[in-house]
Amino acid sequence: MSVRLGIVMDPIARINFKKDSSLAMLLAAQARGWSLFYMEQQDLYQKAGVARGRMRPLKVFNDASRWFELEAESDQPLHELDVILMRKDPPFDNEFVYSTYLLEQAERAGALVVNRPQSLRDCNEKFFATQFTQCTPPTMVSRRSDILREFAAEHRDIILKPLDGMGGSSIFRHREGDPNLSVILETLTQHGSQQIMAQRYLPEIKDGDKRILMIDGEPVPYCLARIPAQGETRGNLAAGGRGVAQPLSERDRWIAAEVGPHLRERGLLFVGLDVIGDYLTEINVTSPTCIREIDQAFDTRIGDKLMDAIAAQLAAR
């Protein structure tokens, strides 16, 4: 099967070779003989109603000293690619939204876009999880300090975080009696002008914030537990957490079964569920990571499984 695969990502020269999931995907695609084409967000544009890209043929290598090679740039309609991986990291800003508009045009013209552009817009990574109340801890979203204070008083120990953060940035823990609630709320809500999320604190975070990877609605059988550094409440690797790969628990599988059909329905082919203890806390749809860490521990070949799912979708068209 001859496949032309494009990727939209952050600069490939600056990725973390050991941990980058996009590189794992590209290596798996190239191993199948698929042709790779590299783009950054700035390379997408529209002309005469056609979404186009300034793209460069790409080769990738499993070599920490030289992991990519780019050829000369060409200008092509995006729909001439069979599949496009949208792997641009947050922030989820206007430029990200505009990129989804362009990718959606390519999708309408025949390209498979992973993940579906409309769902990237619709499924905020924190807010989307609130659709699954059977899986989540007590949670609320508000920008009013009085409503948030009521939640804090009810649960006594809570986490407060922005709806658009990543990597554990701007996450605060508030405990009953802490005098800093006012400044936390002012900072996160920007003085009542921005919605934020509050969740009951889960002490199970000490055992790790688990990243469960989902491929076409089905879980990879192993996850990465991201264990907080000493004195931290955030397990994110970007915040200094330590990753430990482990098999899924029965509760993890139950959560995946609750969420999976909705992901498949929305064209969310590759997703990361964040689970603390028995509770779903976030659903990461934009650029989920942790492929390489899990692969290294259990030889799961997650990139291959994702390419299998993509090939199946292309064959079904």
Curated annotation (Swiss-Prot):
Positions annotated to bind ATP: 152-208
Report whether Metal-binding shows up as a keyword of the record. yes
Cofactor comment in the record?
Binds 1 Mg(2+) or Mn(2+) ion per subunit.
* Gene3D superfamilies reported in the protein's UniProt record: 3.40.50.20, ATP-grasp fold, A domain (3.30.1490.20), ATP-grasp fold, B domain (3.30.470.20)
Give a GO molecular function annotation for the protein: ATP binding
The pathway to which it is assigned is:
Sulfur metabolism; glutathione biosynthesis; glutathione from L-cysteine and L-glutamate: step 2/2
Cofactor(s) needed:
Mg(2+); Mn(2+)
Catalysed reactions listed for this entry = gamma-L-glutamyl-L-cysteine + glycine + ATP = glutathione + ADP + phosphate + H(+)
InterPro entries referenced in this protein's UniProt entry, alphabetically: ATP-grasp, ATP_grasp_subdomain_1, Glut_synth_pro, GSHS_ATP-bd, GSHS_N, PreATP-grasp_dom_sf
What EC number is given for this enzyme?
A: 6.3.2.3
Q: What class of enzyme is it?
A: ligase
- Keyword annotations from UniProtKB, A to Z: ATP-binding, Glutathione biosynthesis, Ligase, Magnesium, Manganese, Metal-binding, Nucleotide-binding
Provide the Gene Ontology terms for cellular component: cytoplasm
Q: Which residues are Mg(2+)-binding?
A: 282, 284
Q: Which residues form the ATP-grasp domain?
A: 126-311
Family affiliation: Belongs to the prokaryotic GSH synthase family.
Q: Which PANTHER family match?
A: GLUTATHIONE SYNTHETASE (PTHR21621:SF4), RIBOSOMAL PROTEIN S6 MODIFICATION PROTEIN (PTHR21621)
Which HAMAP family does this one have? GSH_S
The molecule here is called Glutathione synthetase
Organism classification: Bacteria, Pseudomonadati, Pseudomonadota, Gammaproteobacteria, Pseudomonadales
